[in-house]
Amino acid sequence: MSDILRKIEAYKRDEIAAAKAHVPLAEIKARAKDADAPRGFLAALEAKRRSGRFALIAEIKKASPSKGLIRADFDPPALAQAYEKGGAACLSVLTDAPSFQGAPEFLTKARAAVALPALRKDFLFDPYQVYEARAWGADAILIIMASVDDALASALEATAFELGMDALIEVHDEAETQRALKLSSRLIGINNRNLRTFETSLETSERLATMVPADRLLVSESGIFTHDDCLRLQKKDIGTFLVGESLMRQEDVTAATRILLTGKALAEVV
């Protein structure tokens, strides 16, 4: 685990302990059970791909540790609607406060403004956080293999499945990819960002894609800025992307989303 992830784990475990003291496990489980039914995150991505289009997980992210503030004019419901209008299949919403200035209400409000499924983008170290995610309305969770061992990854995934959620399993290298493939989830995300240098390279997705069987849905994450980047990854049978920063910085988020997905600013007439 990188030094960055160790620091994140330390404050996350403090957060989890405080959350459990404030809302006991039995209570968060009850809230998760009472939440609206999951919308089908994987199903939404697969539907886009079956229609011959790229599938986009559009990220709502106010800030990041490496780039600082990304968008000052930050309105999660409006951003969610802009992404939906631009053709996104799903949302990813940051809920981590210390590193990303995220919040649970960003997820809840963004999802309520659209019909798209939403992923809780956060660092998960306890199944409690999965119940938390469902209680907030999340349809999917992220499991970062660089930050968890196999037993914890399996426990997080099992909790998500128990709640009818999907799990995006994130990998950065060959060893993590091999571990991810032992899990049941068909959603494998390849993060093109090196967690030690913070540099991004699409070569990471191109390299690791060769290890992943065809029955899994590959998602390329980070470092995707243009339609040409999407076309480049398509050559490796990757047609699903998670994009945040490059869209969040645009004045017209809907047009930027359309250009990324289709190369054109105007919506195609169907």
Swiss-Prot record:
PROSITE patterns, sorted: IGPS
Any GO molecular function: phosphoribosylanthranilate isomerase activity
Highest taxon above the source species: Bacteria
Keyword Lipid metabolism: no
Catalytic activity: 1-(2-carboxyphenylamino)-1-deoxy-D-ribulose 5-phosphate + H(+) = (1S,2R)-1-C-(indol-3-yl)glycerol 3-phosphate + CO2 + H2O
Name of the top EC class for this enzyme: lyase
Alphabetized Gene3D superfamilies for the sequence: Aldolase class I (3.20.20.70)
InterPro entries referenced in this protein's UniProt entry, alphabetically: Aldolase_TIM (IPR013785), Indole-3-glycerol_P_synth (IPR045186), Indole-3-glycerol_P_synth_dom (IPR013798), Indole-3-GlycerolPSynthase_CS (IPR001468), RibuloseP-bd_barrel (IPR011060)
Keywords per UniProt: Amino-acid biosynthesis, Aromatic amino acid biosynthesis, Decarboxylase, Lyase, Tryptophan biosynthesis
Protein's pathway: Amino-acid biosynthesis; L-tryptophan biosynthesis; L-tryptophan from chorismate: step 4/5
Gene Ontology annotations of biological process type: L-tryptophan biosynthetic process
EC nos: 4.1.1.48
Family: Belongs to the TrpC family.
NCBIfam families: PRK00278.1-2, PRK00278.1-6, PRK00278.2-4
Protein name: Indole-3-glycerol phosphate synthase
Species of the source: Mesorhizobium japonicum (strain LMG 29417 / CECT 9101 / MAFF 303099)
The organism's taxonomic lineage, starting at the top: Bacteria, Pseudomonadati, Pseudomonadota, Alphaproteobacteria, Hyphomicrobiales
Name of the encoding gene: trpC
